[in-house]
Amino acid sequence: IIVWSLGNEAGYGPNFEKAYDWIKSYDQSRPVQYEQARHDGKTDIFCPMYMGYEDCEKYAQTDNPRPLIQCEYAHAMGNSIGGFKEYWDIIRKYPKYQGGYIWDFVDQGLRDKSKITGREIFTYGGDYGRYPASDNNFNCNGIIAPDRRLNPHAYEVRYYYQNVNRRSEERRVGKECRS
């Protein structure tokens, strides 16, 4: 466990504040995050959803000591994850902006056989008759497929995650070197 989470999208109020207080009394070594706590509530991490680039940069420039880690960002529905580079340009520029969690990371589909073709397919929800079948991909919207193969946009994520940034000082000349 590196961070305790009180979840997200569940409102905010005294029960969440009591939960935060209990966790902190039990374990002071780890931060606690809760998306609905926003700027002023009980959270050690400012963790909004889908904050735009400009707002991320503005927050990173404030004197608020809480790091910014988006609890959802870079929505990966279909073959999209547009704007990932722009987020990572800001993340690398400001140490306070520490990243985010891609929604969704893994497709939530079930392996089955097509009743029409007999081919293996991934199914969900309406494919089982509970509500009208849909060609939308609300459950199969991750960067990794249900069989754990990489979807096309996973390669873009890998590209931006690949760098190891470092700073060192050139001893002979006394100049800072960045790479």
Task: Give residue spans per PLM region.
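Extended substrate-binding grooves/exosites of carbohydrate-active enzymes
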Residues: 1-168, 172
